[in-house]
């Protein structure tokens, strides 16, 4: 697949973000038979290009939010609108860290869609220099070892926890089920990617905010699960 076939950050704008958020929320509501979802209605050419995306669901509790689900896809196997729809349903009902979302929770959640660039492997002979190749606030990370171990952390996670690049590497290793220093092993693949974030402000309107990971403020005390 050529890069030209993939959605890029430069393809995106606020209107596309609003449509992606609506697709995500309506995909969840469709499971409860509250709406009839028809992805064919979304004609924007960008939405019909292949894309990579994660959907994060946060639950509002006592004026704070906590993670309620986060699932995504780093293989561009379908149009962006389909990837976001599938990721939203998976985040709501198939994240193994949480019970399936209930109908009663629909009014207490906010949805975030992160569009990813194509992951690229970081190639460096001296593994101790790996942290210097990672830009916290811009890069997300993937750790892969063989076919059994894989872990991904979105770029905004490092910003939210105020991590440095070495801590980010260690936490991604842990997410993959490996030791924190796995990134020093030459057989472990380290990939990085960028992302653009669309976040609901209010579930009752189509108003959203567009964020770069570097815009995210540290709020580590509010998190109990990693994305």
Curated annotation (Swiss-Prot):
Residues 15-209 form the AMMECR1 domain. SUPFAM superfamilies: AMMECR1-like. It comes from the Archaea. Disulfide bonds: none annotated. InterPro entries: AMMECR1, AMMECR1_dom_sf, AMMECR1_domain, AMMECR1_N, AmmeMemoSam_A, Uncharacterised_MJ0810. NCBIfam families: AmmeMemoSam_A, TIGR00296 family protein. This is Protein Saci_0792.
